[in-house]
Every structure is written in C-alpha cells, then in structure tokens.
C-alpha cells in the first residue's frame, strides 16, 4: 500500500467516527519494545472504557483525539506505522515512538447497527 492510500484510510476512519458518538468505546493500549515477537507477557497493557462524545484532529502536534466523559485519548498521526480494521467496529493503530518503543491502540465500538 502506498503512503497516500495509507493516509486516506486513516482520514476515512476519522471522517466516519461520528457514527459511533454515544457508543460505549473500549480502548486497549499496549506498550512494547519488540514488534517482531509481540510477546503479551512483555507488553504493558491498559484498558479504558467510555462513551464517545466527540473526536477531532489537533493540528498542533498532529494528534487524532477521542473524548468521553472524564476521558481523553490521543493518537499521534505522524507516528502511525500501521492501521487496520480487525473486524466489525474494531480497529488497531500502531505508533512508533523510537527505534524500539511502540504503542498499540485497539479500539472497539459497541455500535448498535
């Protein structure tokens, strides 16, 4: 996939995210240092759940933002190295923060349709 197609997939995801407003949203976040083996035992995981209220793109810092009540989550657009739809209403972003530090963000929307 070329860079423009990859970028367009991410843009399309955020252009259509408003259909999930009001939906329960799960974000599973993992920090790891070895994307080749991706050993779950060597990855630090966090889980957050909230109702998605709004989303936006913050030009300062190139951040993709999702917000819920008492919850705010950002993904660095310029650090995304992978984006895929894992299933119906399930998505995964991988950001690279240094040579060997990666953040995996799995998003699941509990969407009624």
What would you call each of these model-derived segments?
Residues 1-17, 21-113:
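Short beta-rich binding modules
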């Amino acid at each position: 996939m070329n860079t423009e197609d990859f970028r367009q997939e991410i843009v399309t995801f955020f252009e259509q995210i408003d259909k999930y407003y009001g939906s329960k949203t799960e974000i599973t976040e993992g920090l790891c240092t070895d994307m080749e083996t991706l050993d779950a035992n060597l990855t630090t995981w966090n889980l957050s759940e909230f109702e998605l209220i709004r989303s936006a793109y913050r030009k300062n810092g190139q951040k993709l933002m999702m917000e819920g009540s008492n919850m705010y989550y950002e993904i660095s657009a310029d650090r995304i190295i992978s984006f895929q739809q894992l299933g119906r209403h399930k998505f995964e972003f991988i950001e690279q923060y240094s040579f060997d530090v990666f953040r995996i963000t799995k998003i699941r929307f509990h969407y009624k349709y």
